[in-house]
């Protein structure tokens, strides 16, 4: 009896740790999102060559978030970050209509990787504050998300600079990763 109570208590109140990989094309807003979550403020960013990694504490969960640069020359390196990833955040620049096909192709290429087969997918439809931004439904359609029948996925409209939508996305991510455990 005591052991089961201890397990229940630790399951409810112990800090959970989750490994999250955040990728997307260059200039989608990944680093801005990372530091908005970590610091609650906008930081001046430069294109990420390599990666940034931060621990984001949110609702009894410790998210280790790997933000990996998105320039086309370094995308082949993404695969080195796949191991043990529980959640994949794919950040889309909702205003970048010219690279929708490129973003879709990169997303599907990653989702076909064996090391990511169990990872849940959160798509951040970022830059929703811009006047020409595609909404979440349009991004869902253009990225072929409905074809992902064997994967838990969710799309969240966001604005990295204001923080709008980011924590709603983390809520979904934490609930879905915890349910798989």
Swiss-Prot record:
Its main location: Golgi. Coiled coil: none annotated. The keyword Nucleotide-binding applies. Keywords: ER-Golgi transport, Golgi apparatus, GTP-binding, Hydrolase, Lipoprotein, Myristate, Nucleotide-binding, Protein transport, Transport. Its EC number is 3.6.5.2. GTP binds at residues 24-31, 67-71, 126-129. One of its GO terms (biological process) is vesicle-mediated transport. A lipid is attached at residue 2 (N-myristoyl glycine). It is an enzyme of class 3 (hydrolase). InterPro entries: Arf1-5-like, P-loop_NTPase, Small_GTP-bd, Small_GTPase_ARF, Small_GTPase_ARF/SAR. It is found in: Golgi apparatus. Belongs to the small GTPase superfamily. Arf family. PANTHER family: ADP RIBOSYLATION FACTOR-RELATED. GTP-binding protein involved in protein trafficking; may modulate vesicle budding and uncoating within the Golgi apparatus. This is ADP-ribosylation factor 1. The gene is ARF1.
């Amino acid at each position: 009896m005591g052991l089961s109570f201890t397990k229940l208590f630790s399951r409810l109140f112990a800090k959970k740790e989750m490994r999250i990989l955040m990728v997307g094309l260059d200039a989608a807003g990944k680093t801005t999102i990372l530091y908005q979550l970590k610091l609650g403020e906008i930081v001046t960013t430069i294109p990420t060559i390599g990666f940034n990694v931060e621990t984001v504490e949110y609702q009894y969960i410790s998210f280790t978030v790997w933000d990996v640069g998105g320039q086309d020359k370094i995308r082949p390196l993404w695969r080195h970050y796949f191991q043990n990833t529980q959640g994949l955040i794919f950040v889309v620049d909702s205003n970048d209509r010219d690279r929708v096909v490129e973003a879709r192709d990169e997303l599907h290429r990653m989702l076909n990787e064996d090391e990511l087969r169990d990872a849940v997918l959160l798509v951040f439809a970022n830059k929703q504050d811009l006047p020409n931004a595609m909404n979440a439904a349009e991004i869902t359609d253009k990225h072929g998300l409905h074809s992902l029948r064997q994967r838990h996925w969710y799309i969240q409209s966001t604005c990295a600079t204001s923080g709008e939508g980011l924590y709603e996305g983390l809520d979904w991510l934490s609930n879905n990763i915890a349910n798989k455990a």
